[in-house]
Amino acid sequence: MANLRKTHPLLKIANDALVDLPTPSNISAWWNFGSLLGLCLISQILTGLFLAMHYTSDISTAFSSVAHICRDVNYGWLIRNLHANGASFFFICLYLHIARGLYYGSYLYMETWNIGVVLFLLVMMTAFVGYVLPWGQMSFWGATVITNLLSAVPYVGNSLVQWIWGGFSVDNATLTRFFAFHFLFPFVVAGATMLHLLFLHETGSNNPVGLNSDADKIPFHPYFSYKDLLGFIIMLTALTMLALFYPNLLGDPDNFTPANPMVTPPHIKPEWYFLFAYAILRSIPNKLGGVLALLSSILVLMVVPILHTSKQRGLTFRPASQLLFWILVADMLVLTWIGGMPVEHPYIIIGQVASVLYFSLFLVLNPLVGWLENKVMNW
């Protein structure tokens, strides 16, 4: 029986990924977020499945069906709160996972990193179409504003928007297809995650010092399986606390009002995890320019490995680059704050400065400082 996991065609795959996987002995808690993201995905698929059993994707009943889930379905309120707040935890883990990759130079595993960026985009798309489903005011107007951005595409823009809407405005056809997409995408994400892991296990994990750790590897189980379990407990406890005590803390009050195409909410803004990208979008006065900046804010991650100039992999022994990293973190927080603010002075100029700094850090300052550090160390 002990060797069945090493010989059985299916168990062998799981064994090589979760049990006998050679893992660097010095990876810190920052390496927990990959498995936490897996847990988030499973949790979201399960809670989402139970919600889909009671939800109706029709504009006349969608809002009522969500109310029905919360009032009449056994533990429906809990499932809904876990699902809505689970999305927030998903993005918290995502941002920390990406930050870890940027800090320790994990992006030099190019295939793993690029699939990771694609995964990030897929999760963002999933969250966006999911936010439309309750059919509240912010759902409707968020869908209208964000889908309208496609009209900035030259020549085919307007046709593209109407094609996505399934008509001349966000309507029943839009809601129905968004529900279909929201059901489908998590499984696409799960598939892409398998690829992400496949490429990661070709090279093995990076580690905090950024050196080859082949000489000092330990089995994943029991060491890191138990370490991950601690992370699971902490995250599930935090999620449960949020869902039970402050379920609406991160939501928008406007979404408790049923969608009304005749009334525009005073401030249209996405969920908190998209605010940084929304701030970058708004900081450019031109529509097409804003859309390109929005896309670039995510796709800039793909050029990070190409612009890596340092002879060292991570930032562990590079104080100047560490400073830039923490400036980037602060800049993201400023952009998140600005994204939730009205478009007026002084928020406009703060957003524009923060957006310029965001791209400068990735495209100019980091490569430059990496090169300078090489010079200082006589490499």
Curated annotation (Swiss-Prot):
Heme b b566 binds at residues 97, 196. PROSITE patterns: CYTB_CTER (PS51003), CYTB_NTER (PS51002). The keyword Transcription regulation does not apply. Its main location: mitochondrion. CDD domains: cytochrome_b_C (cd00290), Cytochrome_b_N (cd00284). GO terms for molecular function: metal ion binding; ubiquinol-cytochrome-c reductase activity. It is found in: Mitochondrion inner membrane. SUPFAM superfamilies: a domain/subunit of cytochrome bc1 complex (Ubiquinol-cytochrome c reductase), Transmembrane di-heme cytochromes. Its cofactor is heme b. Keywords: Electron transport, Heme, Iron, Membrane, Metal-binding, Mitochondrion, Mitochondrion inner membrane, Respiratory chain, Transmembrane, Transmembrane helix, Transport, Ubiquinone. Binds 2 heme b groups non-covalently. The chain crosses the membrane at residues 33-53, 77-98, 113-133, 178-198, 226-246, 288-308, 320-340, 347-367. Belongs to the cytochrome b family. This is Cytochrome b. It comes from Anguilla anguilla. The gene is mt-cyb.
